[in-house]
Amino acid sequence: MYEYIKGKYIDMYKDYIVIENNNIGYKIYTSGSTMAKLPSIGENIMLYTEQIVREDFIGIYGFLTKDELSMFKLLLTINGVGAKAALSLLSISNVSTLKYAIKVGDEKTITRAPGIGKKTAQRIILELKDKIEIDISEEDDEQIINKVTDDKKVLEAVAALVTLGYSEKEASKVINLCDKNNSLEQIIKEALKHLMK
């Protein structure tokens, strides 16, 4: 029903904020990630929104970026993941970190979200792994790239990509998206497919 809302940022509570527009205060549920990036109270903001209507509840959920809103909607497609759990997942760190954790099957990161157990994390990974695309040029990678490894095959694959002209940072990130059970040659081929998307 609502694509976005613009207005004055009035107040912040535990899991929602209040935005005033045309003398109406809107209660907007949001993630810790969005809350952390909000400007000072009293300033104007715009949030991309999704309205959820249930028999016993009507709520508006809002996020600073379309990417976070899209991830919120995607999480809601998982059986057992409601709006509260989706917000919890988005509050882990940022959208890129969550996407990366799902893509590489990092249950530990996903279960850091309050209310998300191992089985739910496994279901999220299973159902969303192939639906998520990661932009390897994104710059908010500090928390999601530098996976230290002693795997000789992985190190060799990274070195091979570096010789092809890719940066070590870019190579490390894309190698972590690949199936490490494959041969060195297969890992490099898979990595190049990701890089050429």
From Swiss-Prot:
Region: Domain III, residue numbers: 149-197
Entry keyword Electron transport: no
Family: Belongs to the RuvA family.
Ranges for region Domain I: 1-64
GO MF term list: ATP binding; four-way junction DNA binding; four-way junction helicase activity
Region (Flexible linker): 144-148
Keywords: Cytoplasm, DNA damage, DNA recombination, DNA repair, DNA-binding
The keyword DNA repair is assigned to this record: yes
UniProt protein name: Holliday junction branch migration complex subunit RuvA
HAMAP family: DNA_HJ_migration_RuvA
GO terms for biological process, alphabetical: DNA recombination; DNA repair
Localization, UniProt: Cytoplasm
Subunit structure: Homotetramer. Forms an RuvA(8)-RuvB(12)-Holliday junction (HJ) complex. HJ DNA is sandwiched between 2 RuvA tetramers; dsDNA enters through RuvA and exits via RuvB. An RuvB hexamer assembles on each DNA strand where it exits the tetramer. Each RuvB hexamer is contacted by two RuvA subunits (via domain III) on 2 adjacent RuvB subunits; this complex drives branch migration. In the full resolvosome a probable DNA-RuvA(4)-RuvB(12)-RuvC(2) complex forms which resolves the HJ.
Chain positions covered by the region annotation Domain II: 65-143
GO CC annotation terms, alphabetical: cytoplasm; Holliday junction helicase complex; Holliday junction resolvase complex
Chief subcellular location: cytoplasm
SMART domains reported for this sequence: HhH1
Family matches, as SUPFAM superfamilies: DNA helicase RuvA subunit, C-terminal domain (SSF46929), Nucleic acid-binding proteins (SSF50249), RuvA domain 2-like (SSF47781)
General function of this protein: The RuvA-RuvB-RuvC complex processes Holliday junction (HJ) DNA during genetic recombination and DNA repair, while the RuvA-RuvB complex plays an important role in the rescue of blocked DNA replication forks via replication fork reversal (RFR). RuvA specifically binds to HJ cruciform DNA, conferring on it an open structure. The RuvB hexamer acts as an ATP-dependent pump, pulling dsDNA into and through the RuvAB complex. HJ branch migration allows RuvC to scan DNA until it finds its consensus sequence, where it cleaves and resolves the cruciform DNA.
Signal peptide start-end: none
Domain remarks: Has three domains with a flexible linker between the domains II and III and assumes an 'L' shape. Domain III is highly mobile and contacts RuvB.
Gene name for this UniProt entry: ruvA
